[in-house]
Amino acid sequence: MIQRRETFLNNVAEKLGRGRRTAGVKRPDYTVKPQFEVMKEHSSDQLVNVLSEQCTKIHTDVKQTKVDRLEQAIDNVLEEYSARNVITWNDPRFDQFGLTSFLQREQVEVWDHTEGERLVEKAEQADIGITFADYTLAESGTVVLLSGNGKGRSVSLLPTYYIAIIPKSTLVPRMSQVTRELHLKAASGERLPSCINFISGPSNSADIEMNLVVGVHGPIRACYIVVEDR
């Protein structure tokens, strides 16, 4: 597409029956922006309630806990899912939220981008993958994951089950807030991740026969653990 951009755009203009417009096109300055009004007055507790209600519709479990009980909350989910082998991101938030000892367990593998192929295989074999959410959309029950060296996509994609740890401060009403923040970061010259994933619960597919099938393109079960920030 990038290589043939001019040809493509010329063809579109021709089909429209006019010449190419290469100047004088301005982005509309909208005076009304309703996308930012939805739930803008909601407190973090209200957003948690919205998230929890939405997650009942997307087959996603939601747990709430405090930092000092986070490791126990994870253990409870592992037991509930009968999951043993774990793979996690290499993310400083695991230490910040008191999970240093959890990462040192024998059955826990921590992502290392220098061992990509081996870790992809480990992710395929893992019972459960655990990451932190960078943003969380209450309206749609979506966690947003920003890729990075220690934050391999395989961790949330390949294991049988998935846990997203959601710091309460990451909750926003909807996608509007996240896209605006990412746009502002890009406009200020900040380099954005090469991959930004929006994950709404376990893998659901019903696009062929209109019958819901879970786990075709990812984990068959997902749990969001909402945790109070330090």
Swiss-Prot record:
Query: Gene3D superfamilies recorded for this chain?
Result: NagB/RpiA/CoA transferase-like (3.40.50.10420)
Q: What is the official name of this protein in its record? A: Lactate utilization protein C
Q: Report the function annotation for this chain.
A: Is involved in L-lactate degradation and allows cells to grow with lactate as the sole carbon source.
Query: Its Gene Ontology biological processes?
Result: lactate metabolic process
Q: Which InterPro entries does UniProt cross-reference here?
A: FTHF_cligase-like_sf, LUD_dom, LutC, NagB/RpiA_transferase-like
As recorded in Swiss-Prot or TrEMBL, the protein's gene is named: lutC
The similarity comment for this entry is: Belongs to the LutC/YkgG family.
The organism's superkingdom is given as Bacteria
Origin species, per record, is Halalkalibacterium halodurans (strain ATCC BAA-125 / DSM 18197 / FERM 7344 / JCM 9153 / C-125)
Could you tell me which cysteines form disulfide bridges?
none
Under the heading PANTHER family, the entry gives:
LACTATE UTILIZATION PROTEIN C (PTHR43682:SF1)
